From Swiss-Prot:
Belongs to the conotoxin M superfamily. This is Conotoxin QcIIIA. Its main location: secreted. One of its GO terms (molecular function) is toxin activity. The cysteine framework is III (CC-C-C-CC). Expressed by the venom duct. It is found in: Secreted. Disulfide bonds join C1-C13, C2-C9, C6-C12. The keyword Chaperone does not apply. The modification 4-hydroxyproline is found at P11. Causes scratching in mice. GO terms for cellular component: extracellular region. Keywords: Amidation, Disulfide bond, Hydroxylation, Neurotoxin, Secreted, Toxin.
Length: 15
């Protein structure tokens, strides 16, 4: 999830 698409995985990427 939090690897390439941070836009799609918001819960995974707080920043």
């Amino acid at each position: 999830c939090c690897s390439q698409d941070c836009l799609v995985c918001i819960p995974c990427c707080p920043n």
